[in-house]
Amino acid sequence: MSKTRVYELAQQMGIDNKELMARLADAGVSVKNHMAVLEDSDIKALSAPAQTPHKEVSQEEVRVKPTLIRRRAKAVEPEAAAAEAAPAPAAQEEAPLKAEPEKVEPEKAEAPKPRQAAEPVRARIIEAAPVPKPAAAPAEAAKPEKEKPAEPAPAPKAAEAPAAPAAEAAPAPAPAPTEAPAAKPEAPAPTAPAAPVAAAPAEAQAPAKVEEPEPEKATPTRARILGRVEIPIPAQRPAERREYQRTAPGERPAPRPGMPRGVERPGTERPAPRPGGPRPAGAPGRPGERPTTGRPGGPAGGRPDRPAPLAPIDAPPLLGDDRRKGRKPAPAGGTDYAKNGKKGAPAAAGKGKKETFKDILDKRERVFEPGPRSKGKKGKYEKVQIGKKTEITVPKAIKRIIKISESITVGELAKRMGIKATDLIRALMKLGVMATINHPLDFDTATLLATDFGYEIENVALDVDEILEAEPDAPESLLKRPPVVTIMGHVDHGKTSLLDAIREANVIAGEAGGITQHIGAYDVELNGKKITFLDTPGHEAFTAMRARGAKVTDIVILVVAADDGVMPQTREAVNHSKAAGVPIIVAINKIDKPDASPGKVKQELMEFGLVSEEWGGETIFVEVSAKKRINLESLLEMVLLQADVLELRANPEKAARGTVVEAKLDKGRGPVATILVQEGTLKSGDYFVAGVHYGRVRAMQNDRGEKVLAAGPAMPVEVIGFNGVPDAGDIFVAMGDEKQAKEIANHRQMKLRESELAKHSKLSLEQLYEKIQKGEVKDLNAIVKGDVQGSVEAVAESLRKLSTDAIRLNVLHASVGAITETDVNLASASNAIILGFNVRPEVKAAALAEKEGVDVRLYNIIYDAVDDIKKAMEGLLEPTFKEKYLGRAEIREVFSVPKAGMVAGSYVTDGKIVRNAQVRLLRDNMVVYEGKLGSLRRFKDDVKEVATGYECGMSLENYNDLKVGDIFECFEMEKVAGKL
């Protein structure tokens, strides 16, 4: 015979060693460990084929209380039960129910029946209601009252399969005997194994007899079918093998599902439970009490007028046969009902599964069992799956799409994907990218990473350009609009004076130094026609302003002084106008001056392609005088004529779009911006976005301070309602709602912050080395505050241009508004100076600046600010040392003086010799020594200096190698202030 070890058989079956040992124990084969040797008979007992079960019907019942009988039968339809019961022999069908006690073993002893394996059958748990005493009561359920707490002996396994068909024939409640317990049945002698087979047909009719319902209390006596479950019945075990059981005093052996029962030896009896034995969990008298180790939901008794709740159907199985076969766990107690037969207590006595569960705990893991179901509820416990491995779930396809906005950090991407950040960092290293958890990833890199982990990246970045893209207008919706005219030219050529004369106002009187330092927008009406003027600064620092003015304008008036001619800013204005493709009208101003030369101006402008119409060109030239108001109307007529030629049109019925011409921070009104509406109509209450700021139009004013409710195309207005001061030149767009405007502004702020962080990124090793090499470079930090955004921008740009290789000027902060305590604190922390342009510090800020020693400088003319900063930067430069020649003396004689060393008698040939100066010793025009004079004497007196033509005695410090003919050259080093 071939011998097989336990672990070899487990490998062949594809199961664990412990699981195979548990199956062997269930089959009655005792093994010590996984190295135990199995005989062929053991293997056959473990995997015996299924056989057709006997037609014996085992009616298992237990009297929980006088009016409640718990029964277990096959769970099929009544018609199927009748069909199954038909093949039974006639003699078996005629067996009366009253003869049942003769074939049924009492609780104390019961003959085992040979068990045959059958296909999985269905079982029902039927709860019977109290009924009157029937004519014939099944004696198998009779039990003395005093033995109620005791536990019945287990039924043979052979009754397990036949018990199921009995339930099919008895869907109606069966009568429960009430007085049978009074008569104690005698215990017949044990029978041979064949006796139960013969008794089985008689038992098959028992459910049929009991099936007849009582007419009394039809509703209460109706049985409730709580569930239906597949119960696998293992194959029959060879009869010659003894059943492996452990029997303790006062309790029956523990039945195991799937364990074939052997045939009991004749002449032996099972020990019956003693009346005073321990009460099992869920025994009668404790309704609803949860069994500790037994089957959940054991019956509760104690009151004869109320049935106990049945066990929950969906409790997990206590043994693993079903689980091993891949089936769903059988309902708690279902397997025991089928196995216990007619007298194997259906766990109602509480101890039905106690031993089994303990055996399981010895062989398998502990299983959680829910407590008993509360009375009156029909719900089921959730099934507790045991022994399952952790299942790796894969998210749905829609869950594997990650939406990002242009960029995402490594940590955020890992969180969205549900993986560890270290895994992403490791994947980035493979791609050659050294990143940290806060490292931002662009869309392409994130896509590569996500693909490796089975995810997709979707770019949901806000497309600002697409949202703010101007929609083309239909030709029929375009209406004529006023022209926008920008006045440009060199400083002091009379641009603002000309505009004042046109507007009949005195704007220049309010400008510091008589020069324009911010851009202005004005609306002028001439003969019923409107013209919008933009006045730009002419100073070189305001190049950006002039460029913005040229971009938003339709016509440029180039002002040139007749007595000064073309200047640098004049050339710049011409270049800006040509770059913007704007037509130019030349206004030759100051023709009232005696030295005016309009012809010279026309000739100089020809170099730039501006040829007068009088000379055959296309450029309009008008000779005007702003001071004397000469030819002003002619100039305006030329402007209107040029506008008619351009056919300027716009759609006033759409959302407003425009440009921020100028912006400032008003103490009472907050941020105020001058907006030039270019298309559409801006109304009060409209939401808008401009650059990184957004807001709502709270109020609008024109250039005269009058309140305006709506501003159409080519109309300049001051808008109040920004959440911050916008930059001059920002595009102003009216939005449909605040949410969209805020979203766009926040998106732009994020992009601006990213660009600023990129500028201040960490130094590379090469950059660090260069910085160390340039350690002598000094920094001057400055904070710029101004009245309007354009002026602040101009001053900051002028200061940045002052930076050199020796000293670098850093503008830490530039904003609009008064100098505040925050500015002073920033300056104190960074050792910066504060430059105020047309603003004053607050009282508290001034006191704090004095306390902290912060240098605050106030200006109203840009020239002064630039000059002072130059001086401050020069003060930071290290002074240079320059050698200054003093004189020369020739050694005529050398003397040795005690305690003084060698003394040279010299004659001063040039300049003078100074006592504290430095001296060189020259021999054959070669420097032999350079140091200081030790002494300078004339005769015996120490002197400070000796002039030309005099003799003196000289000695050197720590040097005595003096020879006749050597030359003393006297000099000194003087400091020279550094220059930029």
Curated annotation (Swiss-Prot):
Region G2: start-end pairs: 514-518
Residue numbers spanned by region G1: 489-496
Keyword Heme part of the UniProt annotation: no
PANTHER family in the cross-refs: TR-TYPE G DOMAIN-CONTAINING PROTEIN (PTHR43381:SF5), TRANSLATION INITIATION FACTOR IF-2-RELATED (PTHR43381)
Cited Gene3D superfamilies: 1.10.10.2480, P-loop containing nucleotide triphosphate hydrolases, Translation factors, Translation initiation factor IF- 2, domain 3
Keyword Cytoplasm part of the UniProt annotation: yes
GO CC entries: cytosol
Stretches for region Disordered: 47-382
HAMAP family according to UniProt: IF_2_B
Residues noted as binding GTP in the record, renumbered to the chain: 489-496, 535-539, 589-592
Swiss-Prot/TrEMBL keywords: Cytoplasm, GTP-binding, Initiation factor, Nucleotide-binding, Protein biosynthesis
UniProt function note: One of the essential components for the initiation of protein synthesis. Protects formylmethionyl-tRNA from spontaneous hydrolysis and promotes its binding to the 30S ribosomal subunits. Also involved in the hydrolysis of GTP during the formation of the 70S ribosomal complex.
Domain called tr-type G: residue spans: 480-647
Compartments, record wording: Cytoplasm
Principal location listed in the UniProt entry: cytoplasm
Similarity-based family: Belongs to the TRAFAC class translation factor GTPase superfamily. Classic translation factor GTPase family. IF-2 subfamily.
Top-level taxon: Bacteria
Sequence segments annotated as region (G3): 535-538
Protein name: Translation initiation factor IF-2
GO molecular function (one): GTPase activity
Basic and acidic residues bias: start-end ranges: 53-64, 95-113, 209-219, 262-272, 352-368
Stretch list, region G5: 625-627
Region G4, annotated ranges: 589-592
Record's compositionally biased regions (Low complexity): 78-94, 127-141, 156-171, 194-208, 280-294
